[in-house]
A protein has these predicted regions:
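Conserved donor-binding loops in enzymes that form glycosidic bonds
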Residues: 42-43, 171, 222
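Phosphate-binding glycine-rich loop
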Residues: 66-116, 129-134, 140
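N-terminal "arm"/small-domain region of PLP-dependent enzymes with the aminotransferase-like
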Residues: 1-62
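Conserved donor sugar-nucleotide recognition element shared by glycan-biosynthetic enzymes
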Residues: 64-68, 90-94, 123-124, 148, ...
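Active-site PLP attachment segment
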Residues: 216-222
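PLP-dependent aminotransferase-like
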Residues: 21-22, 103-208
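Short clusters of hydrophobic/aromatic residues that line enzyme substrate/ligand-binding pockets
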Residues: 40, 200, 213-216
Length: 222
């Protein structure tokens, strides 16, 4: 099949066939009919992503490489932030974000075992898991209904001399009260970690400026 081709020509043909394959067998949308199952979550991808997957595989590059660097650069531009690190999941992102705050380079603001971190009582376990994994103590605050985000009126009751950070998720795409939480963190000199994995693309207006969620705290995961 590839006898008369250069490696680049063979690669281009494979990628073109991959695109056609995806469009024919993966991306055909069937009209909904009564009784069809509606999944609450599923894989979301298109032909471009499948082509990139195969393109990377042809080099047998199975870890971070040129696509990773390109994505980190473009994603940082989209968010309007200086740094972006790509990982395999939101759970890993939360773990990495929290680990960064345990660095001795932070001196008196370093999160140590036994320090307290305020979070919600009804939320994602992957928001709380890093706190426990690094030996810190989660301090749970109730949520407000129907947003299922933190009730900022309860924050002052949760703070102590051991509190070092607040780690919260924007639940189901609904931003929590960033203004109130950010003011609270600034007042008490606390880190604010935004778990933005459920809300990428959501915006919040703070101090008259509309900003993407995940970019207002000290660290954000998306």
């Amino acid at each position: 099949m590839f006898e008369e081709m250069t490696e680049q020509q063979a690669r281009e043909q494979i990628l073109e066939m991959t695109k056609e394959y995806c469009e024919k067998y993966h991306n055909q949308k069937k009209p909904y009919k009564k009784g069809d199952r509606i999944p609450y979550a599923s894989r979301v991808y298109d032909a471009d992503e499948m082509v990139n997957l195969v393109d990377s595989s042809l080099e047998f590059w199975l870890t971070s490489g040129r696509f990773t660097k390109e994505f980190e650069s473009e994603f940082a531009k989209y968010l309007g932030v200086k740094y972006c690190s790509l990982v395999n999941s939101g759970s890993s992102a939360n773990l990495l974000a929290f680990m960064a705050l345990t660095s001795p380079l932070l001196k008196e603001r370093q999160i140590l075992p036994g320090d307290e971190v305020i979070t919600v009582a009804a939320g994602f376990p992957t928001t709380v898991a890093p706190v426990i994994q690094y030996g810190a103590v989660p301090v749970f605050v109730d949520v407000a209904i129907p947003q299922y985000n933190i009730d900022p009126n309860l924050l002052e009751q949760a703070v102590s001399e051991k509190t070092k950070a607040v780690m919260l998720a924007h639940t189901l795409g609904n931003p929590f009260d960033l203004k109130a939480v950010k003011d609270f963190c600034d007042r008490h000199n606390l880190w604010l970690i935004e778990d933005n994995c459920d809300a990428l693309g959501s915006r919040y207006t703070i101090d008259g400026e509309s900003r993407l969620t995940g970019t207002i705290g000290d660290i954000g995961t998306s």
